[in-house]
Structure formats: C-alpha cells, structure tokens
Amino acid sequence: MKDIHNNIEFENRDSNKKYGTLYGIGVGPGNEELLTIKAVKILERCDVVIAPTAREQGESIALNTAKNFINSKAEIYLKYFPMKKEKEAEIYENYRFMEKLLSEGKNVVFLTIGDPFVYSTYIYLLEYMKNHNLNIETVPGITSFCAAASLAEQTLVIGDEPLLILPGNRLDSIKDEKYLVIMKYYKNVEQVLDKLEEKGFKYVCVKRAYREGQEILRTREEILNSKD
C-alpha cells in the first residue's frame, strides 16, 4: 500500500494481532489548566506518549503542557516530524515506529498543541493510520486563536458572517471578509499589517496565549517591536 502523502510503500496491518489504540490529543494553547478532562483521563492510563517536534533536537510545548498528567509508567518519545518530501525516509521511520508500538497492544498518545485538526502534524499521521485500518480516537483541544480571542476579549465572528482562517503567506485569499484569523505570520509580519490596514481592518495580535511571556498587542508599533 502507498501512503497518499509521501508515496512510500507500507506493509498492511496484521489481522492476527490485537492492536492498541492511537489517541490524537490536542492539549490546547499550552497551559495545563486548559486540557480537557477526557485528555487527562487518557494520559493517566496510556502506555506510550509521542510528542512531535518541528526541529531536530527541539523541545515540545505539547509535552511540557501535558507532562504532569502522564501515566508515570508510560514510555515518552520526542520525535522529529518534518513534513517535507525530501524527508520521506525519516517520516517513514516515525510512522513505522508507532505502528510497531500499536501492534504490541500498547495504547499510544500523539500530542499536538492546539487542536489536532488545525495546522497539525497529526493530520498527516491520521491519513496514514486510516489507510492501515488502525484504531484511532481523536480528542479535540482549544485552538490558539480561540484562546487568543478570549484573552483579548475580541469577537471572532458573529451572526451569519463567515470567518476566514489563513496562514500569513496566503494574504491573497483575503477578499471581502469582515472577520479574519491569521496564523503563522511571523516571517512576513509587515506585509500582514500592510494588508490589514489596506483593507481597513482593526486588529489585535496575541502571542504565546496562556503561556509564560504572553503578549496582547494592539498597535502596529507594538507588534513590530515585539521580540519573538
């Protein structure tokens, strides 16, 4: 079977084995008090926890958020998940590693910051796991933009208006919307602000919502002077 994302051949699931369950858990914006009760209950009884990192030797905000609730006997692994075509071999090894754990009957938690279905590594993982008929359960988490809106006391959307959510490199997608959420804007913050001001938007920028060093910035000057 070929994975639809990276065209690597995988073995099919062994129907004679009793597989564990993969739990994709969203831990919210990065504050342990914002984990759901369901997430905590699963963490307390899981056998394995896998926390993806965006960089080799990187840390995991998701793991730091969940660590106080993880079963003391659970195995914990930090895994680098580069979602790029040239990194197929590394991605393949990570997938196979998790499949092996599941085939041993272990219940495996895959942590994500925010919600598992919003700009998450879990989305790629889920497609692979579905193709192999593995046991999966997804636990939602509070998204970063919902957390940010709460901190800033800023309405996200109202009535029957649409809400557009986009990354900072897709400003061309902005048409006549009244409500926007722009994520992953840090590489082109000036262009983002220029576009918002051109379109007549009022804006607020929230960084590290509910985490140490959180900032709520309401002017262009504050945003441009803020250090990441």
What function would you assign to each model-found segment?
Residues 117-176:
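Class I SAM-dependent methyltransferase SAM-binding "motif I" and its flanking Rossmann-like core
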Residues 1-32, 37-134, 220-222:
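Class I S-adenosyl-L-methionine
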Residues 97, 101, 167-173, 187-192:
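A short, acidic, amphipathic alpha-helical segment used as a generic capping/interface helix at domain edges
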Residues 22, 174-228:
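A contiguous loop/helix-start segment that scaffolds small-molecule binding in enzyme catalytic cores
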Residues 56-59, 84, 143-146, 211-213:
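Short gly/pro/ser/thr-enriched loop/turn and capping motifs at secondary-structure boundaries
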Residues 46-48, 154, 179:
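Well-ordered beta-strand positions
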Residues 51, 77-80, 138, 158, ...:
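Structural signal for conserved beta-strand scaffold positions within catalytic alpha/beta enzyme cores
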